[in-house]
Regions:
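GST-like domain detector, emphasizing the conserved glutathione-binding G-site
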Residues: 1-116
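Proteins with a high burden of low-complexity, intrinsically disordered sequence enriched in S/T/G/P/A and R
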Residues: 1-4, 162, 180
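Generic structural signal for individual residues within well-ordered alpha-helical segments
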Residues: 22, 69-72, 150, 173, ...
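GST-like fold's C-terminal all-alpha helical module
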Residues: 81-178
Length: 180
């Protein structure tokens, strides 16, 4: 466990759109980290890299060049394929996100077709993860890493779009239960 100051931001009430938060992160997105040097990090991966350098005992991003490369590769894959697909589905169907289909300070209309495509992409990515986890305990190594965290959070987030892990995908299901 690391000890850093945190502040909760109430997304349900759009607190991230308030002036105080916009001054910290004009993109109006979470998470965000303000470093000791007052630099702003607003992407999860950059925050993790910063924290791992500050607290090297964490070692979730790998200990060798090979392991680091594999972990970052999978994190980027999960971000660009699974998280985006879930976001497309959720942000283009949720009544709470009407006119907020994309994060940030500007409003964007929902496009229902993107939700349909997003759901199909989620199903396809489940197949990829299931194959990748076949006969393995973890995604990138013989131990729990940031790649497992990224994938777990994304797979768990599919509950928001009511897309469960299919029963036949035992590799993915077993891994999900193991890391939960």
């Amino acid at each position: 466990k690391i000890n850093i100051e945190t502040k909760n931001v109430d997304l349900r009430n759009s607190e991230q759109m308030e002036d105080w938060f916009s001054k910290i992160n004009p993109r109006n997105t979470v998470p965000v980290l303000v470093s000791k040097e007052n630099n702003i990090f607003y992407h999860s991966l950059s925050i993790c890299v910063y924290l791992e350098q500050e607290f090297p005992e964490i070692n979730l991003l790998g200990s060798t060049n090979e392991e680091k490369g594999q972990i970052i590769n999978l994190i980027n894959d999960v971000e660009s394929n699974l998280f985006i697909a879930i976001a497309d589905c959720l942000r283009n169907t949720s009544k709470a996100m009407k006119n907020r289909a994309i994060t940030g300070p500007k409003n964007y209309e929902q496009i229902p077709e993107l939700a349909i495509r997003g759901r199909e992409r989620v199903k396809s990515y489940f197949e990829i993860l299931n194959h990748q986890l076949s006969g393995k305990s973890f995604l990138c190594s013989d131990r729990f890493t940031a790649a497992d965290i990224w994938a777990f959070v994304a797979v768990d987030f599919t509950r928001a779009i009511k897309e469960p892990i299919p029963d036949l995908m035992t590799g993915l299901r077993d891994w999900y239960e193991r890391v939960s």
